[in-house]
């Protein structure tokens, strides 16, 4: 699995266009429609820097955030304390619990009413059987009829957006960091359906020089029928698959699938 240690500091800058409030609206709409009530406890699997976890916490949800990167969770914890200090998270709001665990073998203290997994995190499960194993664990920790909501990158995105394309992120200096520059190179193998990402990060130090760090990541492209099959084999009922946060129908050029599944017990 990727540890995200190098990219942790710029992860939120790279994903600055993500609308976490709209994503949370989607989850709350599903809770209302399919559960009829707010789940008492929600798992955010592969929570990263905790942006989604904290957005849900602001809305009064008791959250557990699980991620395999200690660096990402350190960012999440810092963000939590910043929200407490600023009053953005009210005194009566439950405080999220962050756990550093691999999503292929995580353990919880009990069950949850719903589980979410955002930003194609499940595509990082590249080994044979790993997706099904993760689904099985999620099912194990869900209450009867609990919801599992997640998204995955599509074959179209791997072929046409990633492919062998390179992307550059230029991040200006801020209050707590110098200027940063990230080069993201993709190499997608259509035969193995594995995409390798090579990230090079340049960070400005206090003396004006730039320090270089490198990180490699890898995602697997899953077909829609593979995801459906893995859900069915692990005891889930697939409720819906849509193309966007607004519930759009699937199309040939869909970049991201959004799934809602229910745990059958």
PLM ranges: what are they?
Residues 1-46:
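Conserved class I S-adenosyl-L-methionine
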Residues 149-228:
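SAM-dependent methyltransferase
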Residues 118-120:
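Residues lining the SAM
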Residues 132-144:
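A short glycine-rich, Lys/Arg-flanked "PGG" loop and its adjoining helix->strand segment in the class I
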Residues 107-114:
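A short acidic, Gly/Pro-enriched loop at the edge of an enzyme's catalytic core
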Residues 50-105:
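Class I SAM-dependent methyltransferase SAM/SAH-binding core
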Residues 218-265:
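C-terminal lobe and adjacent flexible extensions of AdoMet/dcAdoMet transferase-like proteins
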């Amino acid at each position: 699995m990727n540890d995200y240690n190098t990219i942790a500091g710029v992860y939120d800058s790279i994903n600055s266009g993500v609308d976490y409030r709209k994503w949370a609206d989607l989850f709350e709409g599903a809770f209302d429609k399919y559960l009829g009530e707010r789940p008492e406890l929600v798992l955010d699997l592969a929570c990263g820097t905790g942006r989604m976890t904290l957005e849900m916490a602001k809305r009064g949800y008791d959250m557990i955030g699980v991620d395999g990167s200690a660096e990402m969770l350190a960012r999440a914890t810092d963000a939590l304390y910043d929200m407490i200090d600023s009053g953005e998270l009210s005194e009566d709001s439950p405080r999220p619990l962050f756990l550093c665990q691999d999503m292929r073998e995580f353990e919880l203290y009990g069950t949850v009413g719903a589980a979410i997994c955002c930003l194609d995190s499940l595509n990082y499960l590249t080994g044979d059987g790993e997706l099904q194993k993760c689904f099985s664990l999620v099912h194990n920790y869900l209450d009867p009829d609990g919801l599992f909501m997640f998204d995955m990158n599509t074959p179209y995105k791997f072929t046409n957006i990633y492919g062998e394309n390179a992307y550059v992120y230029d991040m200006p200096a801020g209050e707590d960091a110098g200027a940063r520059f990230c080069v993201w190179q993709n190499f997608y193998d259509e035969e193995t359906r594995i995409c390798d990402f090579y990230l090079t990060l340049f960070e400005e130090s206090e003396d004006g020089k730039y320090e270089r760090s490198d990180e490699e990541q890898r995602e697997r492209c899953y077909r829609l029928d593979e995801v459906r099959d893995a859900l069915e084999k692990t005891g889930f009922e697939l409720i819906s698959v849509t193309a966007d946060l607004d519930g759009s129908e699937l199309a040939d050029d869909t970049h991201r699938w959004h799934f809602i599944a229910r745990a059958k017990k």
